[in-house]
Amino acid sequence: DEGLDSVSLSANWMWPCRSQEGEDARLYTAVKALSDFCCSLQINVPTGKDSLSMTQKYPDGSKVISPGTVIVSAGGEVSDVKKVVSPVLVNNEKTTIYHIDFSFDNLKLGGSAFAQTLGKVGDEVPSVQDAEYFRDAFLAVQELVNKGLILAGHDISAGGLITTLLEMCFANVEGGMEINLDKIKEQDLIKILFAENPGIVIQVSDKHKEAVKQILEDAGVGYVKLGKPTDERHILVSKGDVTYQFGIDYMRDVWYSTSYLLDRKQSMNGCAKKRFENYKMQPVEFAFMPDFKGKFSQYGINPDRRTPSGIRAAIIREKGTNGEREMAYSLYLAGFDVKDVTMTDLISGRETLEDVNMIVYCGGFSNSDVLGSAKGWAGAFLFNPKAKEALDKYYAREDTLSLGVCNGCQLMMELNLINPEHKKNGKMLHNDSHKFESRFLGVTVPTNRSVMLGSLSGS
């Protein structure tokens, strides 16, 4: 609701300052540019990180110097998390696709992904020429989002406009676009398709077109109609007498191939090739129980509860744990009164878990995984008598539940808390690829009477 006023930035400066002459001056110029831009937008940069020795030296005297880079992350207040726009094109012919410019600059190819593929850098880089215009554009788009007038949207970044359009189609499995660029003044089609001037592409229902135009025009924000969705699985791009056809499924393979080539250097046992061959063969699908309504009331949950239930749960965390607040809220919604327990509470004896009926070990990277995944956390239980006694007494009771998420699951494995009665216990081993994996997996929950999974039976 507060627009840019609630936005704060975090800047991560990565620069080879000590490696060669002139880098300090380049860093100063970059910092001043960011500072001036933020002052114009009236937003702050209260935090960040500096890595100013970005150089790799080798025994033969050679060295590789990292390019000076700043990574900026923005955070702001979101008053309604349901008002979101995803970059997935809606296959509806009664909609229109628009481009909204944020730069107020001519289209330029300097520093673009297109230039890099040609082994070039370029000397003309697009930038925001008018900070006040940028602010107006941002606020106008926020108004469109707030009023629910945008069906889909995506920013223009690496790869330019054509990559943005393709990525909006990669996210679905059917349909495409027919794009006409005649209303864009620039005549150079390469610049139109590959320039990375700040801007966005939005999809709007035809019944909302006039309302969208009115908001943008009242704000003085430039926009251009690009085209409409089509049932064909391609993007047709035309300007004047020239038309180009981009096959979406073919271009998706091209788009993914760079990731595959990098993955091939990092993954073992042919996993990279298997992933490349399989990545588009697994649509993400969900199947819920027939009587699932997606309402709190179905499970007797009151999200506005302000009275204690008398049943306590505890979040147990170590240095490096994260996600504990979200987990605490989930437990609260499930009816628990939630308390926050740190390992120092258990080690010192301040906390005994005697009044707790459920504990959750949250995920993250306890002790930065320095000793291995959750091994240091497990040691804090095993080698501190009061913490171990509290845990042993907790699991000896018959009125307790426990859950380990991510790093917390690894902890439960290390502590032998999963099926402790088995003669052989599980161990967390390396993946076949010998690297961290984050995949979409299909899991079916069978009919069960588990306290935590019973309501998901058949999902």
Walk through the language-model features, giving the residues of each.
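Intein/HINT protein-splicing elements and their conserved insertion hotspots or analogous self-processing inserts
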Residues: D1, L27-K32, N44, D50-F194, ...
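Residues that flank catalytic or metal-binding motifs in active/ligand-binding sites
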Residues: G68, P198, R439, G458
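A glycine- and small-aliphatic-rich helix-loop capping segment at beta-alpha/alpha-beta transitions
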Residues: A25, K63-S66, F170-E174, K375-F383, ...
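N-terminal beta1-alpha1 cap of cysteine-dependent amidohydrolase-like domains
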Residues: K239, T243-V405, C409-E421, L429-F440, ...
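Thiamine diphosphate
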Residues: D1-F37, K49, K57, L139, ...
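Glycine-rich tight-turn/loop motif centered on a GG-T
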Residues: P16-A25, T117-D130, A378-N384
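General beta-strand structural signal in soluble alpha/beta enzymes
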Residues: L9, P46-G48, A74, H99, ...
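Catalytic core of tubulin tyrosine ligase-like
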Residues: I202, S433, T444, N448-S459
